[in-house]
């Protein structure tokens, strides 16, 4: 396993739309293992392949307190979302130290493949539902800050560029 470099907003590669995984093979399983290691090391609760500059439909998530309930979603698709919506404070490994409110469906049903290539469906709510939607946005080339006002987006870009310059010194 290896730690992968996480792209930082506003890197244009974060806006690439991920392609479906054709076959779940050893290359994809290695990607999943590397993504999980990277996510846990960061530390984060979710990571999309897009964030590590691999533009295939793969996400890893672990919202457990114990950090030992890894969930893998390959070629995920939301097949149902509740009309009820909820506002959550969201953050992102590609947008470090920035948190803001995003409104999303409160409950979703997702269909995907696991790391063995087996199809499954999961209906969930709460933090896991939010995380699935957030990571799936990455696969579509969207970062959570794009739900915010243009003014907030601009402030975030300025703040992140300032942090990048400070780290470069």
Swiss-Prot record:
Its cofactor is Fe(2+). Its EC number is 3.5.1.88. Belongs to the polypeptide deformylase family. Keywords: Hydrolase, Iron, Metal-binding, Protein biosynthesis. InterPro entries: Peptide_deformylase, Peptide_deformylase_sf. Pfam families: Pep_deformylase (PF01327). GO terms for biological process: co-translational protein modification; translation. One of its GO terms (molecular function) is metal ion binding. The active site is at 135. Removes the formyl group from the N-terminal Met of newly synthesized proteins. Requires at least a dipeptide for an efficient rate of reaction. N-terminal L-methionine is a prerequisite for activity but the enzyme has broad specificity at other positions. This is Peptide deformylase 1. It comes from the Bacteria. It is an enzyme of class 3 (hydrolase). The lineage of its organism: Bacteria, Pseudomonadati, Pseudomonadota, Betaproteobacteria, Burkholderiales. Binds 1 Fe(2+) ion. NCBIfam families: pept_deformyl, PRK00150.1-3. It catalyses: N-terminal N-formyl-L-methionyl-[peptide] + H2O = N-terminal L-methionyl-[peptide] + formate. Fe cation binds at residues 92, 134, 138. The gene is def1.
């Amino acid at each position: 396993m290896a730690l992968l470099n996480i792209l930082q907003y506003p890197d244009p590669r974060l806006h690439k739309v991920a392609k479906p995984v054709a076959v779940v093979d050893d290359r994809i399983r290695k990607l999943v293992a590397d993504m999980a290691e990277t996510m846990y090391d960061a530390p984060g609760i979710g990571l999309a392949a897009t964030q590590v500059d691999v533009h295939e439909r793969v996400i890893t998530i672990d919202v457990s307190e114990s950090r030992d309930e890894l969930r893998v979603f390959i070629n995920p698709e939301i097949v149902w979302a509740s009309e009820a919506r909820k506002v959550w404070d969201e953050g992102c490994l590609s947008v470090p130290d920035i948190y803001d409110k995003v409104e999303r469906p409160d409950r979703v049903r997702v269909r995907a493949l696991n790391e063995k290539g087996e199809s499954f469906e999961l209906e969930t709510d709460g933090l896991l539902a939010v995380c699935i939607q957030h990571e799936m946005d990455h696969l579509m080339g969207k970062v959570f800050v794009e739900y915010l006002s243009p003014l907030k987006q601009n402030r975030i870009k300025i703040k992140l560029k300032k942090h990048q310059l400070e780290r470069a010194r």
